[in-house]
């Protein structure tokens, strides 16, 4: 999972591929990183200290900083919300529908996701991370 995704990012940067992400996903990434770190700390130490909570938030911000160095956010406006609503019949996950809308707005060549349902229903070219790594080799 994660190691393949990291390898994909490394390969994409080496190939100088323009990477994009839905700006709406940054809040999800921030939340996941912070909450995962807090959960890990609780498992290891029994409870969450104030310093650990601050560190988790700082880590999440640092990860967003790295993301902004690797990829460009695709903004979201009312037209993306409209486009997401049109995807509801195919894929009823609103967050994923916003990702589809971002890919369509950016006219992305490829949507990379390990979400099998999203891959199968996306109205844009989509593949999982392992297949996307293989695809990168064809661009050289």
Predicted regions located by residue number:
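Residues at the C-termini of beta-strands that transition into short coil/loop
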Residues: 23, 77, 129-133
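Short amphipathic alpha-helical segments and helix-helix/interface helices
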Residues: 6-10, 61-64, 99-100
